[in-house]
Every structure is written in structure tokens, then in C-alpha cells.
């Protein structure tokens, strides 16, 4: 009996052990006793005379046949016939009640039916059947043989077939040689050798008929490519067998094919294996560590290596450095500023130019001039002006249109508002601008005044000056650049190369001439305010901050600079109650050409340099008079120093007094 059949292994679930029944071992025990006993008697009592009388090859031949028969008998008995492991308990909880009884598959174009096995809980493969004796589904089940006490299936059918063939031949040999011995000893039948030979011949003759019949039957089945179960049940009796390959191929497949795999594992004892944790080095001695030299030739001891390893595995990596969101303080030197002009400064972050949400007005009007420009109810500074620190605050990009640029150039045109050019820009056109600190305005005004003084000293014509830094565009231009492309460094610093520069050119036009009687108001007003472009680098912006304007003194030469033509009439200022917060801004004063967005840059320049004729004479433009007055108001008494021209980014030329 195959012991391994009742116990499962590692490849599948173990089959339930069969109950012990002594009746199962009677046939196999009888077959083994007759086979071994009869052959032993034949070899002991009959073969010696055959070897003496005929040849010694006869006993040797019978021994070989007997051993071959016994080997096939043992293989057919103890080998796994091809038992399928049973399904898990949780796999058939739902399928057991709903699964159909049969399922059809196609094999070589022929429909083959598979039956549901309720015991093993799966559909049996083709040519598979459930053995009622072994209580297992066997692949290519042939039959259950009681003489070998095992099922004959795919894995052991070859040995069973060879056992039948060899047993038939062995029975024929034993019976024939025994008959030969009796024929030569007819007068000595009373001897022991003759009696034993007659008994062996009877047993061989008794088993020859069924064994020979069974062998012939299986020869026919092998030639046809069928199994005993298929032949008995008549599955392919009236049709075509899809598993046959011809007579010779079928015989070759049974005798010479490779061994089929085993589906049930063998029962093995558990083995204890020591497995070291991963990523751990084996312990090393001090001698081994001393002999180990690193790549740089430095030897380290075991303790130092353990410390380094513990630090590398336990210590957390350092966090990444936090980005610096503000420009650090840099040394304010002229050499650094000039050297930085030759290099491309880094692209500034966009979050520095977002509008400040703390501005009180809708358009982020400066809090210093909110009460004076919008409401008109006070001519003094608001007490709510925040105290600015040393670090500049970059909130937004103002638009230097109309009078705002003139306030940066002249510094004395904001007479109506009382705070320089910014007040004039708010009075004309009613435009409001983003807020920025007074420190930046003063630094920009000082830079502009220095450039005007140096230009007047060198006897140069005072043309329209462009604000320090690059030419800034309006928020509309920046929005167009953001919508049409990225705010790269080139597009921010050189807007004249972009197509949006033309749309913003009218905001950069020089201002109209201002009446000279407003100069007196500007002389006693707040310090001249200016504008520093936020697109400049940190070094350029810090360099402009250190150039603080000198105290402004009235120039004694103001009497020589009188306008030839009479100034136009000035519109009366609005009373504090004349206009509310929601009312539209006042229109331009009579006699002044309104500065709208239709005026281009060239038109503004033409108005400045176009000579005006009064009584056939040529008079100086008001813009020139205005700039001369601004120049004499600032630094007319100080001796002129050297002027250094520096070309900045965006095509802007700077005149720096050294």
C-alpha cells in the first residue's frame, strides 16, 4: 500500500486518511506471496538442474525477469497515481450550491464534459475520475487495482502495464521450465524436487489465464489510447477519441514519455534554520578590522566603525535649508554697484510684487496721501502713516503715467497736493497708484536731482529723463505679459522689446509744462519723492537708498527764470465738502491739454521741445524752465563733481555723480 497517498505534503492540502481495513491488504498480500514464493521455489529446486543439464543462462534469465517484475509491482503499488489536492474550505462555500454539474471544454476540436466533484469541490479535468476506494480524484484514472492496492492513474500506469507484461512473461517462463523438468523426471515424481516443481507449475498455470487476459486487454487500450474507465463507461465508443495519437504514438507515450509531476507534497519533518537579519554584517575581530584599510589609507578600529555605523543608521538627515525670502543686507559700495551692472542679476521672485492687502484704497493708494488726494478734507499728513524701517518694502509696481513721472523728474510740480510729484499725479486724471514707502521715493528723487544737476553743469540740454532703473510698465502691461508669456527676467527688464511696450508708451510720455507759480508751493512742501523700480536687483536698489537728498534751499536765481508767456488760470481747489469719496476726480485745469492714454511717448516729447512763438520771438519751453528751476532748487550752490555714465539693463543710461 502506498503510505504517502493518505498524507498530504507541501504542494497541496493533505487528503483525509483512509480508515484501516484489513480486507484491502489481502489481495496484495496474496499476490506478493505467490509471486515471491513461487519464484523462490522455482529458483531453488528447478533451476539447478536446468543449469547443469542445459545452460547456466536459464537461472540468470529468470532472476532478471523476476526482479524486473517485482520492481514494476512495487512502483505501481507505492507510487502516487496522480491525486489532485482538494480545494480549501473557503473556496467552495458559494460555488458548491450554485455550480452546475457539468462544464464543457474543447479538446482538439471535440467537446469534452467535465463533472463537478462534490467531494473534492472542483471540476474534474478531462479523463479524471474520483476513486471510491481511495476517495481521491486521480488524473487519467484507469481503475483501482486490488492486487496492488492502489489506483492506476497517469503517474503509475506505465509501471502497472510493464508489471503485467513482465509478470505474464515470468509466469510463462516458470511454467515452461517447470514442465521441462517434469518431463525429464517422469520416473522420479516421488522426489522433493519433482513435487515442488509440480506445485510451482500449478500456481503459474493458475495465474497465467487472468494475468494474460488482463495484459492483452491493456495492450489493446494502450494501442487505442484509452483508459479502462473510458472503455467500460463507453465515453468514446460512438465518437472520436480526442486523446488518441495512433497506435505507435500511443504506445510510445505510455512507455517513453516523461514522468508527470506530483501534485501532493511529501510529508517532511520541520527543519530549523537560523537566518540572520538582513543588512547586518558578520562580527569581525580587532585583527580583521586592523587589516582592513579604507580607500584613503586610513585604518579605523572596531569601536570607531561601530560608532560611524550607528550614527549613519540612527541619525536623521538634516532638514533642507529654508529659502531666504528677503534680500540680505549688502555692503553699499559703488564698486559693487558698477560691477553688478555688467552681470545679469537673478530673476526676482514674483511674490515680492504682489499688491499689498493692507492698503486702504481700492487701487492701493498710498496711505500718506489718501486723505489729501481723495477726500480733500485735510492738507496735513495723516497720523496713520506707518513708520518705515531700514529694509525697503516692495509691495507693487506703480505706473509712472502723466504727472507721476514729472514729479520724479522735476520734484516741484505737486503744489496742489503738497507732496511732490505724487500729488500732481493724483490730481491730474484722478489716477491712484500702489503704495510704496517714503524712503524709496526720497532715494529716487535724490538720484534724479543729481542727474539733473550734473547735466545742467555740463551745459547740456535738459531732455526728458527716464526714471531710475528700467522703464516700468503699467499693471495692464504686466498682465498682458503674464497672459502672453512668462514673467522672465528679460521680459521684465527690457519691456521695450516686447509688443506690449507700445501699449504702455502713452503712460511713459513726458508731462505738460506746469505753471511756474506752483514752484513756491513745492518749495515749502514735503521732500521730493521719487520711485525705485522693483525690477532692479538688490544691489542696485540698496545703492540707490544710500543716496539721500541734501536739504533743499531756495535758489537765488529764481528771479531770472520767469516765463515769457503768462501762466494760464488755475482751477480753484475743491473744498473739503465739494467732493465725496465716490465722486469722480476733477477734470484738468483750463488751459492744460488733458493727458489721457491717447497721448503717445513721441507726442509728449514733441510738446516739451517744440518752441512756442510769442510776438515773433522764440521762447524757452516751459518744461526746460521747470527743469532748470528744479535743478537750481536742489544743488545749485554746491560745486559740480565728476559725472560717470553707466549703462544699465534695458538700455537705460545712468549719470552718477562721483
Swiss-Prot record:
Ranges of compositional bias, category Gly residues: 407-419
Coiled coil: none
PROSITE patterns to which the protein is assigned, alphabetical: DHHC
Chain ranges of the DHHC domain: 115-165
UniProt superkingdom: Eukaryota
Main localization of the protein described in the UniProt heading: membrane
Membrane topology per record: Multi-pass membrane protein
Biased composition (Basic residues): 634-644
Transmembrane portions of the chain: 25-45, 57-77, 160-180, 203-223
Keyword Lipoprotein: yes
Domain commentary: The DHHC domain is required for palmitoyltransferase activity.
UniProt record similarity statement: Belongs to the DHHC palmitoyltransferase family. ERF2/ZDHHC9 subfamily.
UniProt function note: Palmitoyltransferase that catalyzes the addition of palmitate onto various protein substrates and is involved in a variety of cellular processes.
Protein name: Palmitoyltransferase ZDHHC5-B
